[in-house]
Amino acid sequence: MSYGYTARLIQKNKEASDRSLGVKLGRLCIKHDLSVSEVANTLGVSRQAVYNWFTGVNTPKPPLTDLIEELISEL
């Protein structure tokens, strides 16, 4: 497991649609050992919001999508 991510979260991320920007972000964060807390602090959102994006429960809304795309390009 990466950076304290549970097997359940990793599995939900794998099962979620990779068309979602939040799911893509989750896969990269898991791969590169970037914590949910770091992502939440960088984007100014709650950790729960980030978990929901990672698992495809919710999708990030503009203007956060631009910040997320920038973060993804840096990973």
Task: List each language-model region with its residue ranges.
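Short intrinsically disordered terminal tails
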Residues: M1-Y5, S73-L75
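A short, Lys/Arg-rich alpha-helix, primarily the initiator
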Residues: T6-K31
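Non-catalytic, surface-exposed connector residues within folded enzymatic/regulatory domains
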Residues: R19, K61-P62
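Residues in the recognition helix of alpha-helical DNA-binding motifs
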Residues: L28, T42, W53
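Short coil turns linking two alpha-helices in DNA-binding domains
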Residues: S35, S46-A49, L64
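Short alpha-helical "recognition helix" segments of helix-turn-helix
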Residues: E38-A40
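Recognition helix of helix-turn-helix/homeodomain-like DNA-binding domains
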Residues: V45-T59
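DNA major-groove recognition helix of helix-turn-helix/homeodomain DNA-binding modules
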Residues: P62-L75
